Amino acid sequence: EAASGKGDNSVLLNLDRCRLDIRLHDKIPFTEKADRVIFRGSVKSSEQRRRFIETFRDNPRIDTADTRSGHSAQETGTAKQITLYAHLGSKFIMTFEGNDIASNIRWVMSTNSIAVMPRPRNESWFMEGRLRPGYHYIEVRDDYSDLEEKIDYYIAHPEQAQQIIDHANDFARQFYDSRRERFISLLVMKKYFEKTGQLPPTNR
């Protein structure tokens, strides 16, 4: 990964495709989903996630919980993990950067729900730096103070919400060609090995 907007000299390669290259077949239209924000995940090593859960765990419109087990997690409000498809009953899915990138942004953008997140700071092969707030996802402040205002707006304007979903689906779709992705990865590796002197440079 690289810092978003500062990756000109970085080498980005998808080395964890089995975990990150996930897309869901969502058959539930946005208008038929619950007017709810959902988040499940571990808050370990993520102050942002902890702060979100502590702020909204008693809010009936925000379904959020820490999926860690054990006494150390009780203070944040724990719950069992749920399947990715179980998230799809909600119109909005929170997306957080953890130790680095926000890994669930990839599958959320393949669905009929909308990713909600502060502006991403890190960038991977998914090109998060090219994501546009209000176009590919709903951007909220780092302190989430405008979260409910934002979701109320898109609940009241489902046609604009659908536009974001369509744009997100289009963005995610460019990564679905596995042969093309493999070819790009090989070219990236080839160029890296050439630049580091591990392969002789070519004219192509």
Stretch-by-stretch model annotation:
Residues Q81-R204:
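Catalytic binding pocket for nucleotide-activated donors in carbohydrate/polymer assembly enzymes
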Residues E1-I114, P118-E139:
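Nucleotide-sugar donor-binding catalytic core of glycosyltransferases
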